[in-house]
From Swiss-Prot:
<dbReference type="InterPro" id="IPR029026">
    <property type="entry name" value="tRNA_m1G_MTases_N"/>
</dbReference>
<protein>
    <recommendedName>
        <fullName>Ribosomal RNA large subunit methyltransferase H</fullName>
        <ecNumber>2.1.1.177</ecNumber>
    </recommendedName>
</protein>
<feature type="binding site">
    <location>
        <position position="68"/>
    </location>
    <ligand>
        <name>S-adenosyl-L-methionine</name>
    </ligand>
</feature>
<comment type="function">
    <text>Specifically methylates the pseudouridine at position 1915 (m3Psi1915) in 23S rRNA.</text>
</comment>
<keyword id="KW-0949">S-adenosyl-L-methionine</keyword>
<keyword id="KW-0698">rRNA processing</keyword>
<feature type="binding site">
    <location>
        <position position="100"/>
    </location>
    <ligand>
        <name>S-adenosyl-L-methionine</name>
    </ligand>
</feature>
<dbReference type="InterPro" id="IPR029028">
    <property type="entry name" value="Alpha/beta_knot_MTases"/>
</dbReference>
<comment type="similarity">
    <text>Belongs to the RNA methyltransferase RlmH family.</text>
</comment>
<dbReference type="GO" id="GO:0005737">
    <property type="term" value="C:cytoplasm"/>
</dbReference>
<dbReference type="Pfam" id="PF02590">
    <property type="entry name" value="SPOUT_MTase"/>
</dbReference>
<keyword id="KW-0963">Cytoplasm</keyword>
<dbReference type="InterPro" id="IPR003742">
    <property type="entry name" value="RlmH-like"/>
</dbReference>
<comment type="subunit">
    <text>Homodimer.</text>
</comment>
<dbReference type="GO" id="GO:0070038">
    <property type="term" value="F:rRNA (pseudouridine-N3-)-methyltransferase activity"/>
</dbReference>
<keyword id="KW-0489">Methyltransferase</keyword>
<feature type="binding site">
    <location>
        <begin position="119"/>
        <end position="124"/>
    </location>
    <ligand>
        <name>S-adenosyl-L-methionine</name>
    </ligand>
</feature>
């Protein structure tokens, strides 16, 4: 199973990027990061549509798509692990996560998603969400392996 993360914006060196790289390095599944940026100077819905096109083009065709969205489902770590385990056991080749820009995701991405996932009702910095997601994927992997990393 291959994991993909398509995200708007380029991560600068610093703690948020270090957090993502720390957990990506621990994963037993490969996690490929695709950073996308709109080159046109547009705003509002037009920007969200342009970012949607870039995000969807960055993920493999046929991949299971998980969109991080504040209006998505809030899953406990164990439930997230079960979901990943189900996809793994169904021989899903690619699972792609997408993180939108400051204005959020276009409706097109939300409709295309197999799962809308939220990290709670609060709004989080997009660069920090990358590290939080990588940690939750690592945690899920450890839960599925029966490893004591997760102590809920």
């Amino acid at each position: 199973m291959r994991l993909w993360l398509a995200a708007v914006g380029r991560a600068r060196p610093g703690p948020a990027r270090d957090l993502f790289e720390e957990y990506r390095g621990r994963l037993g599944w490969p996690l490929t990061l695709k950073e996308v940026e709109a080159r046109k100077r547009v705003a509002g819905e037009e920007l969200k549509r342009l970012e949607a096109d870039l995000l969807l083009a960055a993920v493999p065709p046929g991949a299971i798509l998980v969109a991080l969205d504040e209006r998505g489902q809030m899953l406990a770590s164990e439930a997230f692990a079960r979901r990943l385990g189900t996809w793994r056991d169904q021989d899903s080749a690619d699972i792609a996560f997408v993180i939108g820009g400051a204005d959020g995701l276009a409706e097109e991405v939300r409709r295309r998603a197999d799962l809308l996932l939220a990290f709670g009702p609060m709004t989080w910095p997009h660069m920090l969400v990358r590290g939080m997601l990588a940690e939750q994927i690592y945690r899920a992997q450890q839960i599925l392996a029966g490893h004591p990393y997760h102590r809920a």
